[in-house]
């Protein structure tokens, strides 16, 4: 059998992906959360796990450094590549991509400034709304931007909305629903079709069982 390399990222996605892989007979031989290693052998001799930054998972899969990856839909939209397949919605790490602004402050009708990590997605969304915006790219602490008058709105991932409210902001419009997806390198799908199809089938069954529970 051919070796499969699966790219994952630490955090919530990893925590919710590992049980799905376990159901497919793939378990890391070491505790990923406690290790500083980035490459892990598994209980399946022909499968290894690669731990990356979330934004790098699609790149590794696109260029074939990993055969398979698990990535949030937000990252995939921003990556904007057609160089891999997206065969499976894992229905994990669910959240929403939303606009938000200072609570009680009405939305401005003219040109506005928007701070976000998701520049491509935000630009597309506001263009579809027919609104003129200046996009400011930030990498974190998004909630500070409106408070410090850096922008009028932010575009960010929202789970419960508690962080927004704690910083005097309120969610406004939902841009899209987000969940984690299984992605596959196109060449790997051809060269390792049997192994990857078996993985997809096993993980899909685990996803369906989880949803039904």
Curated annotation (Swiss-Prot):
Its EC number is 2.4.2.17. GO terms for molecular function: ATP binding; ATP phosphoribosyltransferase activity. InterPro entries: ATP_PRibTrfase_cat, ATP_PRibTrfase_HisG, ATP_PRibTrfase_HisG_short. Pathway: Amino-acid biosynthesis; L-histidine biosynthesis; L-histidine from 5-phospho-alpha-D-ribose 1-diphosphate: step 1/9. It is found in: Cytoplasm. SUPFAM superfamilies: Periplasmic binding protein-like II. It is an enzyme of class 2 (transferase). One of its GO terms (biological process) is L-histidine biosynthetic process. GO terms for cellular component: cytoplasm. Its main location: cytoplasm. Disulfide bonds: none annotated. Gene3D superfamilies: Periplasmic binding protein-like II. Keywords: Amino-acid biosynthesis, ATP-binding, Cytoplasm, Glycosyltransferase, Histidine biosynthesis, Nucleotide-binding, Transferase. It holds the Pfam family HisG. It catalyses: 1-(5-phospho-beta-D-ribosyl)-ATP + diphosphate = 5-phospho-alpha-D-ribose 1-diphosphate + ATP. It comes from the Bacteria. Lacks the C-terminal regulatory region which is replaced by HisZ. Belongs to the ATP phosphoribosyltransferase family. Short subfamily. PANTHER family: ATP PHOSPHORIBOSYLTRANSFERASE (PTHR21403:SF8), ATP PHOSPHORIBOSYLTRANSFERASE ATP-PRTASE (PTHR21403). Heteromultimer composed of HisG and HisZ subunits. Catalyzes the condensation of ATP and 5-phosphoribose 1-diphosphate to form N'-(5'-phosphoribosyl)-ATP (PR-ATP). Has a crucial role in the pathway because the rate of histidine biosynthesis seems to be controlled primarily by regulation of HisG enzymatic activity. This is ATP phosphoribosyltransferase. It comes from Teredinibacter turnerae (strain ATCC 39867 / T7901). The gene is hisG.
